[in-house]
Structures are given as C-alpha cells and as structure tokens.
C-alpha cells in the first residue's frame, strides 16, 4: 500500500514538472509572436493518402513527385540524431513523417522541433515516399508548430483505463482510442443513413418543441424547468409523438424527427436520461406496414453502414438478411415459459399467480394487461436474440395505440427486439378522439394513485384529434441502442459522446 502511494506521488510530481516545462515553452513561443498561428492550410488527410497511395511502390511515388500538406497531433517521435520519425494523427487516422535537419529551414530542427512535445499539433509539407519497410511516409520540407499542448497525452502516465475518465474527458478518449473514434464515426453514418432512407421513402424531417407545457407521448417521469419570461413551469420532452401527430392532422402525411428525449429516470448500461430517438408517422398505414418498413430499414442500414447484413455482437451474430421472427406477446411467454397455459393469461387471478411465482411485485392499480406485460418482460424479453417483432400489446399499457378490431383488449402495436433489448416501438395510432380522452382520463387516475410515470391529460391534443387524424401508423427507434448494436458496445455510455455523470467533488 505504501509503495503504491509512493508511486502515485512520484507520478503526480512528474506530471507537475511536465506541466511547468510545457508552460515555460509556451512563454517562449509567445515572445516570438507565433504561439498559436492560424495561417496554415492542409490539402490532404491521412486516410485519403493511404487510400490513394498505399498500393504504389516507392519508385512510382518518386516518379510522381506527389507533394502534400497535412496537419495533426504528434503522437510519437523517434529522434535519431539529424533525422527523426513522427507519427501524426488527424481525423482520418495516422501517417508517418520523416524529418531531417538538412531538409528544413535553418534552426528549425534543433531549436524548435526537438523542443516540441507529444500532443502538440503540427503542420507539415513534403513529398510522399515509402520506407524500406514499405510504410507510406512524408519527407518533410516544412514543419510548423500550430498549437502548443500544455498537458501530456493521456497514456504517458496513467492512461485511460478508468472508464469514468473516458466519459468525463471524452476528448482524451478520442485522442487515445481508435475504437472510440470508430464508434462515433459509425454513429454519424447511422444517422446519415437513416435520414437518407426516410427521405427516399417520402418522409419529411421536422422539428418539434424540446420544452413542453404538457409532457406526453410516453410513460416516463419528466424533467421540470421554469420559463422566466412566461413565468410557467415547463417540461423537457419525454417524446415528440403528440406534436408529430398534430402535423399529420395538419396535412404532412409522412414526417420524422431525430432528436433528444429526456427522462428523469435511472442510469444503467441501457439507459441515459438524455437519449436520441427517431420517430416517424405515416398516414394511411397501419402497424403491419411499419413492420415491413422497419425490417427494410434495418436491412438497409446494416448493409450501408457495415457492408453486411450480419452483425457481430459479443459472442452473438444477428442476421438481418433473413425474415424477422414475429410472435404475439402470449406466444412469446409460452415459448420461453413452456409450462404456461395460454388460457391462464386471460384470467386475472391465474395471471396474478403466475406473476407472483416469478417474483413480480404487483401494484394495486395494475389490471390484467399490465400483469401479462410484466410476465412477458420477466420470461421472454431477454431471450429475443435474433431480430423479433412482438405484437398484440394490451391496451392498458398502450394508451396511444389503436385498439384491435377483433379484440379491443389488445392494440395494433409491436415492439422490435434484438439481443434481448427493445430497439423500436410502433403501432397503429389511436385516432378516435373520444377513446383518447377516456384513456387520458385513466392515465390521470393512475397518476393520482401514485404512478408518477403515467401520462398527463393533453386537452389540446384531443382537440387536434377532433379535427380528424387520418389512419396513421407511428414508430420510435432508439438510436443509441441501435449504435450499441452496430459497434459491439455493451453500455450506452460508450455510444454517447458526453453521457450524464455525477459532478466530481
């Protein structure tokens, strides 16, 4: 223990000494008037250079005489007397620089370059060549310091093994970890591919309020804020659903939105209070049309983003090339709890007994539909590994979904699961204003009974429905969970650039 404390003290002292030295170097740079120049322009990035020239031999490069200008962060440096090799990292990756004293302006190599530190941002100009080992490199004829880094690279002393540091100081994580940079590149590609798919299918992207007088569109506990000018409390939105459906009433028949939602709930590997959703609404369609659309969307995304219809996640392989499985909620319960008699799920007393045998704590306000849903979540949800649609959700847990014509106790709704996780939720929308008003009233009763996730009564939305909502289907997909899947990430914090964290003391 004492030895560990001593090592920690030594590391802290080393770091303090390095910080002091770097600041002294900055003072000298300021005296020259070139501390932070802004007149250097690059014409190439490392990924483009590798893509175009990795396949060429050194003789070809010499014949071509390709001169390039690059800029980036100095990650490594090997000084060998009058010459050095530098690894430069930019947005596209890394490329090697060959720096020779005799090829630079007088004094640059010894008086400047050797005094620069790892982490400094450099600009370089020179001709491409390949080393004896075949590595594409730049033979520098010009080298400039563009930004002085006052702190060392994160791995020099204690690295970024601490996950909390990776999340709190994401910029360090991105500098040090190729995997993290790739994760967020894939996230960007996913967002772009979704937008392209939606536009190709005739949808219009819109934006709806992030602050709402009445939070709606989902069952969740909202964040509360205060609007000073209006002197009213407002809520960060838990979902955009009710505003998007107002737009369908107004005549925009296919709309979608990609944006953040906020839910004042717990943090877990699958939950962050601020998260990204894509919601879409399509007039003159039902939930079956959405199932087809969802299947096509995921098949297209995997192909466009990953170049394959199969996704590796941990020790599992998900196949998006095959037709997705479709089960009703009751079928799923019976499949993964074979001893269940399906008829018992239609009997309140027997369903209650099943739930209690599973250790489910039943609230007094729960009806049969909520109990069956809890049984499903306990027995089947984690077993839905391959892409699966679960249908026939009870009306009790689906306050915004249209009732099924043959059985009004269930709704025309589905949830989409991959790897035991819910990824999407869609349904035929309830467009009966009187039925919606009644369900809002039931939600208010549940809230009065202590359910702080129950919905508020949104009178303006009911008024919108009274003007006529066409037959409509709506879908919500969790972007963060989708990116987790595509990047083999096992916690949501790994796919959110700046996840919610408790402030450091």
UniProtKB/Swiss-Prot annotation:
Family the entry assigns: Belongs to the class-II aminoacyl-tRNA synthetase family.
Entry protein name: Lysine--tRNA ligase
Keywords from the UniProt entry: Aminoacyl-tRNA synthetase, ATP-binding, Cytoplasm, Ligase, Magnesium, Metal-binding, Nucleotide-binding, Protein biosynthesis
Annotated organism of origin: Pectobacterium carotovorum subsp. carotovorum (strain PC1)
Substrates-to-products reaction catalysed: tRNA(Lys) + L-lysine + ATP = L-lysyl-tRNA(Lys) + AMP + diphosphate
Pfam families, per database record: tRNA-synt_2, tRNA_anti-codon
InterPro entries: Aa-tRNA-synt_II, aa-tRNA-synth_II, aa-tRNA-synth_II/BPL/LPL, Lys-tRNA-ligase_II, Lys-tRNA-ligase_II_bac/euk, Lys-tRNA-ligase_II_N, Lys-tRNA-synth_II_C, NA-bd_OB-fold
GO BP terms: lysyl-tRNA aminoacylation
Free-text comment on the cofactor: Binds 3 Mg(2+) ions per subunit.
Binding residues annotated for Mg(2+) 1, in chain numbering: 415, 422
Subcellular location: Cytoplasm
Keyword Chaperone: no
E.C. code: 6.1.1.6
Main location: cytoplasm
Keyword Aminoacyl-tRNA synthetase among UniProt keywords: yes
EC class: ligase
Gene name of the encoded protein: lysS
Binding site for Mg(2+) 2: 422
GO molecular function: ATP binding; lysine-tRNA ligase activity; magnesium ion binding; tRNA binding
Any one cellular-component term (Gene Ontology): cytosol
């Amino acid at each position: 223990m004492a030895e560990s404390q001593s090592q920690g003290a030594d590391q802290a002292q080393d770091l303090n000494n390095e910080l002091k030295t770097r600041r002294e170097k900055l003072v000298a740079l300021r005296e020259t008037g070139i501390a932070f120049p802004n007149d250097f322009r690059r014409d190439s990035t490392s990924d483009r250079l590798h893509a175009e020239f990795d396949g060429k031999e050194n003789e070809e490069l010499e014949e071509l005489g390709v001169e390039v200008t690059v800029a980036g962060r100095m990650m490594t440096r090997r000084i060998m007397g009058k010459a050095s090799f530098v690894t430069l990292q930019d947005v596209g990756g890394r490329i090697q620089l060959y720096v020779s004293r005799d090829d630079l302006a007088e004094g640059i190599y010894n008086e400047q370059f050797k005094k620069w530190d790892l982490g400094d941002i450099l600009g370089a100009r020179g001709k491409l060549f390949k080393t004896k080992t075949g590595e594409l490199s730049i033979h520098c004829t010009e080298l400039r310091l563009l930004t002085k880094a006052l702190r060392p690279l994160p791995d020099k002393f204690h690295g970024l093994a601490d996950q909390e540091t990776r999340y709190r100081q994401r910029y360090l994580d991105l500098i040090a970890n190729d995997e993290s940079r790739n994760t967020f590149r894939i996230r960007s590609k996913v967002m772009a591919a979704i937008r392209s798919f939606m536009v190709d299918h005739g949808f219009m992207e819109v934006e709806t309020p992030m602050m709402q007088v009445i939070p709606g569109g989902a069952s969740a506990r909202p964040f509360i804020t205060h609007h000073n000018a209006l002197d009213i409390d407002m809520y960060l939105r838990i979902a955009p659903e009710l505003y998007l459906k107002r737009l369908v009433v107004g005549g925009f028949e296919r709309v979608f939105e990609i944006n953040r939602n906020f839910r004042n709930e717990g943090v877990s590997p699958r939950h962050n209070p601020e998260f990204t959703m894509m919601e879409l609404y399509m007039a003159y369609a039902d939930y079956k049309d959405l199932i087809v659309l969802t299947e096509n969307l995921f098949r297209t995304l995997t192909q466009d983003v990953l170049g394959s219809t199969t996704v590796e996640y941990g020790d599992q392989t998900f196949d998006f090339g095959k037709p997705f499985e479709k089960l009703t909620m009751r079928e799923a319960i019976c499949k993964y709890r074979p001893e269940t008699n399906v008829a018992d799920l239609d009997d309140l007393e027997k369903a209650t007994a099943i739930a209690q045998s599973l250790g489910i704590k039943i609230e007094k306000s729960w009806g049969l539909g909520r109990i069956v849903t809890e049984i499903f979540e306990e027995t089947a949800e984690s077993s839905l590994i391959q892409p699966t649609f679960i249908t026939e959700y009870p009306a009790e847990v689906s306050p915004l979904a249209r009732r099924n014509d043959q059985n009004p106790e269930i709704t025309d709704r589905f949830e989409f699961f991959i790897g035991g996780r819910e990824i999407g939720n869609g349904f035929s929308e309830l467009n009966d204003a009187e039925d919606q008003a009644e369900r809002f009233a039931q939600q208010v009763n549940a809230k009065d009974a202590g359910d702080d996730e129950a919905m508020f009564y949104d009178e303006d939305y009911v008024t919108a429905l009274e003007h006529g909502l066409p037959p409509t289907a709506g879908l919500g997909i969790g972007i963060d969970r989708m990116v987790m899947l595509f990047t083999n990430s096992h916690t949501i914090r790994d796919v959110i650039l700046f996840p919610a964290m408790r402030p450091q003391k």
